[in-house]
């Protein structure tokens, strides 16, 4: 199995913790010269396994109770090609590899073990995991009751407010849980963000491409509230092709992803790559740090208007992305680009034969013009608004006269969107 995810989302810590359940735990870190050299000079998997077994005093009969962890596997094409032989020659030995920026190495790996590997994906902590990290188990249990009750709502809103500001990077959350001191976090953000900047440019094919990537990571945060154009991105002179290629590298690294809209109102969700995309950072806390708005956010009672209304939609998309642990899929949004009636719905959720529109608004008074355009075209009467209020369901009508059902959800329910949609459709028998 390969555990995939951006740097510093907790892959190594997670596998090391899991390794405690085995009698024997062997770790190779391919960023360390000694471990990398061991792999490179091994002529076969048999030779490597025999050496590791001898070094760690393990016999073949112990393999079922042994976990071999190969960390930073993106550093070695040979290690990746070895994975198929672990599967074929030592099926009783448990092997987990972890890596970031894997796409770049996989392109160059000749003997890639297709069909021999399972993938799991790891993301920054979502809100549920953030509550669990704080030991808020009773509140988490109330969160998981569908629908959530009014008593828990205020406490959940307060916790989500802080989560929106600091984000879900494990080192950040661990520090905050231990010290409850937001002033101690900027140095950690700086270290994490600089690591990402240094990492991604390693995979540029030329100095010119490196410069484009540097420009993007230094300016992209300012454009999270809008759809982008590649040509002259960030007020530069870079051409569309240059920027597109650089964004592809950043997207593969999961540091800054490019999200394309769809225009259909029925499944399947089909991204339209001719339309202008929008950007999704790995973590909203890093985004807030890069925008230098965390101090301002601390003073706000309601984050719905934070940074031109972009922060809450960004964190909700991050929440939805975090659920893709076995099959990585980007989030989707819907657009209608017409001169007289353009529209944009923040999020689409596929549910059976329906595409469910999710609009993210500051309150019940916010305009639902775009949502209404989707509802008018959709073959079902179902829509969701995520806002800063309590859970409720209302029967309403679009300005064009189409009756529909609107489920209003508090912002903090991003990871439970599918459960609520299922609850709603079941309750109202909308099939």
Predicted features, each with a name:
Residues 1-2, 6-8, 17-23, 251-431:
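A cross-kingdom feature that marks ATP-driven nucleic-acid transaction machinery
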Residues 11:
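Conserved lysine of the Walker
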Residues 21-36:
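Conserved catalytic segments around the Walker B and adjacent sensor/switch elements
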Residues 32-64:
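Short glycine-rich substrate-engagement loop in P-loop NTPases that contacts/grips substrate
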Residues 60-79:
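Conserved P-loop NTPase "ATPase switch" module shared by AAA+ and STAND
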Residues 89-110:
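Sensor-1/coupling segment of RecA-like P-loop NTPase cores
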Residues 103-119, 131-136:
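Short regulatory helix/loop adjacent to the ATP-binding pocket of P-loop NTPases
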Residues 132-313, 321, 332-335, 340:
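Interdomain hinge/linker elements that couple catalytic modules in large macromolecular machines
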């Amino acid at each position: 199995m390969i555990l995939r995810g951006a740097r510093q989302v907790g892959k190594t810590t997670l596998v090391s913790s899991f390794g405690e359940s085995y009698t024997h735990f062997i770790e190779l870190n391919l960023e360390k010269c000694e471990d990398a050299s061991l792999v490179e000079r091994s002529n076969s998997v048999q030779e490597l396994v025999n050496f590791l077994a001898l070094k760690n005093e393990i016999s073949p009969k112990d393999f079922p109770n042994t976990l071999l962890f190969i960390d930073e596997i993106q550093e070695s094409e040979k290690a990746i090609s070895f994975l198929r032989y672990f599967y074929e020659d030592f099926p009783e030995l448990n092997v987990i590899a972890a890596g970031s920026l894997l796409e770049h190495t996989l392109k160059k790996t000749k003997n890639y073990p297709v069909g021999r590997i399972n993938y799991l994906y790891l993301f920054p902590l979502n809100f549920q995991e953030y509550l669990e990290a704080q030991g808020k188990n009773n509140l988490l249990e109330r969160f998981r009751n569908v629908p959530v009750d009014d008593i828990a709502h205020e406490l959940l809103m307060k916790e989500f407010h802080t989560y929106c500001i600091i984000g879900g990077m494990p080192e950040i959350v661990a520090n905050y849980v231990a010290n409850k001191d937001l002033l101690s976090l900027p140095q950690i953000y700086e270290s994490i963000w600089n690591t990402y900047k240094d990492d991604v440019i390693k995979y540029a094919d030329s100095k010119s491409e490196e410069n484009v990537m540097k420009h993007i990571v230094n300016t992209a945060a300012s454009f999270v509230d809008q759809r982008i154009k590649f040509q002259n991105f960030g007020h530069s002179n870079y051409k569309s092709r240059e920027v597109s290629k650089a964004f592809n590298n950043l997207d593969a690294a999961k540091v800054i992803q490019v999200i394309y809209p769809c225009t259909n109102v029925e499944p399947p969700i089909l991204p339209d790559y001719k339309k202008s995309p929008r950007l999704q950072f790995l973590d909203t806390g890093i985004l807030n740090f890069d925008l230098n708005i965390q101090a301002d956010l601390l003073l706000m009672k309601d984050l719905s208007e934070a940074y031109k209304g972009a922060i809450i939609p960004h964190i909700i998309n991050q929440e939805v992305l975090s659920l893709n642990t076995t099959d990585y899929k980007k989030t989707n949004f819907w657009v209608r680009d017409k001169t007289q009636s353009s529209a944009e719905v923040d999020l689409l959720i596929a549910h059976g034969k329906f595409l469910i529109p999710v609009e993210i608004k500051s309150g019940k008074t916010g305009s639902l013009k775009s949502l209404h355009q989707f509802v008018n075209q959709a073959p079902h009467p179902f829509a969701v608004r995520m806002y800063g209020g309590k859970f409720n369901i209302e029967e309403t009508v679009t300005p064009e006269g189409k009756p529909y059902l609107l489920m209003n959800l508090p912002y903090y329910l991003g990871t439970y969107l599918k459960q609520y949609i299922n609850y709603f459709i079941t309750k109202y028998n909308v099939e």
